[in-house]
């Protein structure tokens, strides 16, 4: 039995009010509830404010190079499949210079718990727009507003044939712990997008859902097998309209609870899951929080080790040491 304190280490050096503080506390709690011994866990990050996180974990950890956290985490997991590996990146580190590693880790379905801390800004380098900053966003590197459309992390994950995608808000401790535990339970690559604030360079970037009252009005918590309802009294629901979704008020205009969709996170076809994941950008729909997609599939690391065992069994020499020790050998003293 572990407590959150068993996973704590050091004094976090983030700005007061930074979303990283909230997420770190939830990660400590989630790891305690998961129950894997600290010495069997590795937390691997790239470069950025959020990538300082391994310094504050009493586990194995690596604060590595810019954009390469997923690649290094892949090596760690394949080399030691018994290790529980968490990979932490920000939206800049993970989706700009690290974008290729992000999509290929998902495509290969490596058994990594990938955390994307999304504050829509480069914080460590003092306020440049990131791949998730909205079009028109004014920053130090876009003083007249960006002229680019942003990445939407769910689209990248799903487009790379990802099998697990969840979303939480850093200030929602219970919701964050729940999705982190689900990510751990998933066999294969899991992506958890964490909506968090940057109080210095992008304050209020997720304002609509950053506090409890806002989430009641502007978010929907999705759970497999449950109705897609939301609102302060669950008075609204999502129904299918053609190839899209529609928000309805239950009990009005002929809509009843029976018309409301039931969330299926395990459906291999990701069409409706992606529509849920993309809601909530000023389109009149709520932001979907929780486990949006969770589908089983073979993992890269299992396939690699199975292939090695199969091929090795067919060979005369089963490993490098056996090869070296064949024929005439001698020892130099």
Where are these regions (language model features)?
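Active-site diphosphate/adenylate-binding microenvironment
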Residues: 4-65
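Flexible, low-complexity linker and terminal segments
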Residues: 9-10, 200-333
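Short beta-strand segments
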Residues: 44-46, 88-89, 113-118, 193-195, ...
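Glycine-rich beta-alpha junction loops
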Residues: 47-49, 119-121, 172, 195-200, ...
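Thiamine diphosphate
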Residues: 49-123
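Conserved thiamine diphosphate
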Residues: 130-185
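ATP/pyrophosphate-binding catalytic subdomain of soluble kinases
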Residues: 164-221
């Amino acid at each position: 039995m572990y407590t959150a304190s068993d996973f704590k280490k050091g004094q976090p050096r983030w700005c007061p009010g930074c979303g990283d503080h909230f997420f770190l506390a939830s990660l400590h709690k989630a790891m305690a509830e998961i129950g894997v011994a600290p010495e069997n866990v590795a937390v691997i990050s790239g470069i950025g404010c959020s990538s300082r996180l391994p310094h504050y974990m009493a586990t194995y950890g690596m604060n590595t190079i810019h954009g390469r956290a997923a690649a290094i985490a892949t090596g760690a997991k394949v080399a030691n499949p018994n290790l529980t590996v968490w990979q932490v990146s920000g939206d800049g580190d993970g989706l700009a210079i690290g974008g290729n590693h992000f999509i290929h880790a998902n495509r290969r379905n490596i058994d990594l718990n990938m955390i994307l801390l999304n504050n829509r800004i480069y914080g460590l380098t003092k306020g440049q727009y990131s791949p998730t900053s909205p079009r028109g966003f004014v920053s130090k590197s876009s003083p007249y507003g960006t002229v680019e459309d942003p990445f939407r992390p769910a689209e990248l994950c799903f487009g790379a044939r990802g099998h697990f995608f969840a979303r939480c808000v850093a200030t929602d401790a219970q919701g964050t712990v729940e999705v982190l535990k689900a990510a751990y339970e998933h066999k294969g690559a899991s992506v958890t997008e964490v909506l968090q604030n940057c109080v210095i360079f992008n304050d209020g970037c997720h304002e609509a859902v950053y506090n409890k009252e806002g989430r009641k009005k502007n978010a929907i918590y999705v759970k497999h097998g449950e109705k897609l309802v939301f609102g302060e009294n669950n008075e609204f629901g999502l129904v299918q309209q053609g190839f899209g979704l529609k928000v309805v008020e239950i009990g009005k205009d002929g809509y009843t609870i029976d018309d409301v969709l039931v969330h299926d996170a395990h459906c291999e076809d990701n069409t409706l899951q992606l529509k849920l994941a993309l809601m909530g950008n000023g389109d009149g729909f709520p932001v979907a929080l929780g486990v949006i997609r969770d589908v089983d599939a073979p993992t890269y690391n299992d396939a690699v080790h199975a292939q090695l065992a199969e091929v090795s069994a067919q060979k005369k020499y089963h490993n490098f040491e056996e090869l070296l020790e064949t024929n005439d050998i001698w020892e130099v003293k």
